[in-house]
């Protein structure tokens, strides 16, 4: 990942500088999330855009027809530059790095939350408040995923901190305690 990160950082940093000047950083961050979601869920899209067989012009034409109405000109220009330079295989890393740089520049903490079932709005608000106090910032972004294997409860990852309030985690800890006792 360090090599991919060193490739992604200049592109992501340039995009952040441009979007800051144009005051569209938040909009582009949301578009990056949407694009990442589409990229991760569409294997045919990934295969086509990373194929060494397709010419850069064909990739740019496809990207323009697919995304020109959904993304800002700044993000569209980045996609075209990546296509021209045969860097579309690094698109995911570039978008993720942009989001990291965006959060860092605005002091936004990212918490990855796995819950056994979807959280109610009230639970999400309480969780957001707790994560804000843990992070020491009022700006938090919560990446919430449902994971039924937790049986009940949730797990929060905030940087290097982990809070495991899941039933499966409690069962695992109980098993470890019993193994130590015997």
UniProtKB/Swiss-Prot annotation:
Keyword Membrane: yes
Cross-referenced SUPFAM superfamilies: N-terminal domain of the delta subunit of the F1F0-ATP synthase (SSF47928)
Keywords tagged on the record: ATP synthesis, CF(1), Hydrogen ion transport, Ion transport, Membrane, Thylakoid, Transport
Localisation: Cellular thylakoid membrane
Gene Ontology CC: plasma membrane-derived thylakoid membrane; proton-transporting ATP synthase complex
Record bears the keyword Thylakoid: yes
PROSITE patterns: ATPASE_DELTA
Source domain of life: Bacteria
Membrane topology type: Peripheral membrane protein
InterPro entries for this protein: ATP_synth_OSCP/delta_N_sf, ATPase_OSCP/d_CS, ATPase_OSCP/dsu
Gene Ontology MF term list: proton-transporting ATP synthase activity, rotational mechanism
Similarity annotation: Belongs to the ATPase delta chain family.
HAMAP family membership: ATP_synth_delta_bact (MF_01416)
Quaternary organization: F-type ATPases have 2 components, F(1) - the catalytic core - and F(0) - the membrane proton channel. F(1) has five subunits: alpha(3), beta(3), gamma(1), delta(1), epsilon(1). CF(0) has four main subunits: a(1), b(1), b'(1) and c(10-14). The alpha and beta chains form an alternating ring which encloses part of the gamma chain. F(1) is attached to F(0) by a central stalk formed by the gamma and epsilon chains, while a peripheral stalk is formed by the delta, b and b' chains.
NCBIfam families: ATP_synt_delta
Function description: F(1)F(0) ATP synthase produces ATP from ADP in the presence of a proton or sodium gradient. F-type ATPases consist of two structural domains, F(1) containing the extramembraneous catalytic core and F(0) containing the membrane proton channel, linked together by a central stalk and a peripheral stalk. During catalysis, ATP synthesis in the catalytic domain of F(1) is coupled via a rotary mechanism of the central stalk subunits to proton translocation. This protein is part of the stalk that links CF(0) to CF(1). It either transmits conformational changes from CF(0) to CF(1) or is implicated in proton conduction.
UniProt name for this protein: ATP synthase subunit delta
Organism: Synechococcus sp. (strain CC9311)
């Amino acid at each position: 990942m360090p090599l991919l990160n060193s490739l992604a950082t200049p592109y992501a940093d340039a995009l952040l500088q441009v979007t800051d000047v144009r005051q569209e950083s938040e909009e582009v961050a949301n578009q990056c999330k949407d694009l990442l979601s589409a990229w991760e869920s569409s294997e045919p899209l990934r295969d086509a855009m990373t194929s060494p067989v397709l010419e850069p012009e064909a990739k740019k034409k496809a990207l323009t027809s697919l995304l020109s109405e959904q993304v800002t000109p700044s993000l569209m220009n980045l996609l075209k530059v990546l296509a021209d330079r045969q860097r579309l295989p690094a698109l995911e890393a570039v978008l993720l790095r942009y989001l990291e740089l965006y959060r860092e520049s605005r002091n936004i903490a990212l918490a990855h939350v796995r819950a056994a079932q979807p959280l109610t709005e009230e639970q999400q608000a309480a969780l957001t408040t707790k994560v804000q106090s843990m992070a020491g910032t009022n700006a938090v972004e919560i990446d919430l995923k449902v994971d039924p294997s937790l049986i009940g409860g949730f797990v929060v990852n905030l940087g290097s901190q982990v809070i495991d309030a899941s039933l499966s985690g409690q069962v695992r800890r109980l098993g470890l305690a019993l193994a130590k006792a015997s």
